[in-house]
Regions:
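Bacterial N-terminal signal peptides that target proteins for export
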Residues: 1-9
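Hydrophobic alpha-helical targeting segments used for export or membrane insertion
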Residues: 11-13
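C-terminal motif of bacterial Sec signal peptides marking the signal peptidase cleavage site
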Residues: 17-19
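Bacterial signal peptide processing site
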Residues: 21-23
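Extracytoplasmic redox metalloprotein regions
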Residues: 25-66, 70-217
Length: 217
């Protein structure tokens, strides 16, 4: 194919660029954006907004919501107890109530360096897979750490030794943008200390997980 004349090439380029500029301009809200949940959208915007039932939940179902919400909010206790509906805590655990991790039914957060525990963040444990673990991997997806299992539990009921302590340290990292603006970020470093049941597998893998939002619970 012979090369296009210079003027024709410029015209094709201009048309191509104008076509690229046909993308929609989101300068104002689209229909429905103000009620992203449709008929379930609630009007509250305060710290309790995630803890409310759907706006279209009929009154006859509000009792069911309240009962479920109480189980999510109230602490579990050691068995035996008169609170039989919520007993059975421990012997090892990460926290004694769902909402301790899913704060106000929202997202959790990593612990601060001086925190006494890692509530709202947990640590998953695994070791490298091998043919001998084929059935375990098929069932669980990973191979749990042999002593501490698949999830590190840093709390325990009285008389039981917790599995250890979870601590996160932070190193300041300075980041500079192209316009010269500088911001200081924090690089986290996970530390597992005071192991209560002996050393871990030397090739243990750690995965810190912050509790996700559980809106409406």
């Amino acid at each position: 194919m012979p090369p296009l004349p210079l003027r024709l090439s410029a015209l094709v380029l201009a048309l191509g660029l104008s076509a690229c500029d046909d993308a929609p301009r989101f300068t104002k809200a689209e229909p429905g954006e103000a009620r992203s949940g449709g008929k379930t959208t609630v009007r509250k915007t305060d710290q309790n907004a995630f803890s409310l039932p759907s706006a279209n939940l009929p009154p006859s179902r509000r009792v069911d919501f309240s009962v479920g919400n109480s189980f999510f909010r109230n602490p579990w206790v050691i068995a035996p107890s008169t609170t039989t509906a919520r007993d059975g805590l421990g012997p090892l655990f990460n926290t004694n109530a769902c909402q301790n991790c899913h704060i106000k039914d929202g997202r959790g957060h990593p612990p601060e360096p001086d925190a006494s525990n890692a509530v709202s963040m947990l640590v998953r444990l695994s070791i490298p897979d091998a043919p001998a673990y084929a059935q375990v991997i098929e069932r669980l997806g990973v191979v749990p750490e042999p002593v501490y299992g698949g999830q590190f539990q840093d709390m325990a009921i009285p008389g039981v030794v917790p599995e250890g302590k979870v601590r996160v340290d932070y190193t300041p990292v300075l980041v500079r943008f192209k316009d010269g603006t500088e911001v200081e970020l924090r690089k986290p470093s996970l530390n597992i200390t005071q192991l209560g049941y002996g050393p871990m597998h030397p090739d243990t893998r750690f995965s810190a997980r912050v509790a996700p939002p559980m809106i409406g619970l």
